[in-house]
């Protein structure tokens, strides 16, 4: 039987692949520790020009989230009392959904978004989805109530989990959302060139430290407790999360609309005019 080859992501710096494989040869446990640190450390990007206006015009405040003992930066964009919550994904920032924000502002709404822990202007260097969820609930308590919630990637997963934990919104939109946490870990380990054994060790480490089943935070699990209308967007060319995950998520939502796009990938979809128009229609026009 031919040996299975690992699908290393060409976007991953070669030194990371080299270091991981070097450590694995010494000890799988060293490689797991290395991979786990990478997994919880987002990359901070400079704010692109298209987000300058939202960044400049938003009222920015710091919010302490007691449940995780961390401080985040919150962006209040627009003046309407009718508010929509926006949640960015991994290595994103509070202004990343600017095109969507501008569209809903034109329709009489304002937005509240935030830099998740270890993202944007928020402090610390590491985080995980649990902290995204707790941040959402803290933001709702301080800045809510919200009419709707829109999340991209990990932000979509976090919104569904937050709804399960009590976030009150009338409708939600998830764009390019992750689904199975175990699949995310497995894919991450594969992309950095390490054997599946490291993914198993990572899962064991997280579950031992935080005392929970990682898969219980999967979007499809949370979806079973979500009864509000949810619009699911996903692109067939999403290079980070396969479109099959969107279909699996949708199977577990009782009240959903699914739109599959093409040639937009994981991030370009956030600025696509037709996607934004459908979001506005779903949230603000469709009854």
Regions found by a protein language model. Give the residues of each.
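An N-terminal hydrophobic leader/cap segment in hydrolases
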Residues: 6-64
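Alpha/beta-hydrolase active-site loop
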Residues: 126-147
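Hydrolase active-site cap/lid region
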Residues: 164-212
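Conserved alpha/beta-hydrolase
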Residues: 94, 101-123
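Gly/Ala-rich beta-loop-alpha elbow adjacent to hydrolase catalytic centers
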Residues: 150-159
């Amino acid at each position: 039987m031919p040996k299975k080859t690992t699908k290393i992501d060409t976007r991953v710096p070669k030194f990371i692949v080299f270091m991981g494989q070097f450590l694995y040869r010494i000890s799988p446990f060293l490689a797991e520790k290395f991979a786990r640190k990478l997994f919880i450390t987002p990359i901070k990007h400079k704010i692109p020009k298209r987000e300058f206006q939202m960044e400049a015009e938003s009222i920015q405040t710091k919010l302490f989230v007691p449940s995780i003992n961390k401080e985040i930066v919150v962006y209040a964009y627009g003046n309407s009392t009718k508010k929509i919550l926006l949640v960015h994904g991994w290595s994103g920032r509070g202004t990343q959904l600017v095109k969507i924000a501008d569209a809903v502002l034109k329709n009489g709404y304002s937005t509240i978004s935030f830099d998740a822990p270890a993202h944007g202007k928020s402090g610390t260097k590491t985080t995980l989805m649990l902290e995204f969820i707790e941040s959402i609930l803290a933001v709702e308590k301080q800045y809510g109530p919200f009419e709707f919630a829109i999340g991209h990637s990990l932000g979509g997963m976090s919104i569904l989990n937050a709804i399960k934990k009590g976030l009150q919104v009338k409708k939600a939109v998830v764009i390019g959302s992750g689904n199975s946490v175990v699949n995310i870990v497995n894919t991450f380990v594969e992309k950095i060139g390490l054997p599946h054994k490291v993914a198993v060790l990572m899962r064991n480490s997280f579950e031992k430290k935080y005392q929970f089943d990682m898969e219980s935070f999967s979007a499809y699990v949370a979806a079973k407790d979500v009864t509000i209308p949810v619009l699911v967007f996903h692109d067939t060319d999403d290079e980070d999360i396969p479109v099959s995950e969107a279909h699996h998520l949708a199977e577990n939502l009782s009240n959903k609309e699914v739109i599959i796009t093409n040639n937009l990938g994981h991030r370009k979809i956030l600025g696509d005019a037709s996607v934004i128009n459908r979001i506005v229609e779903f949230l603000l026009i469709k009854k």
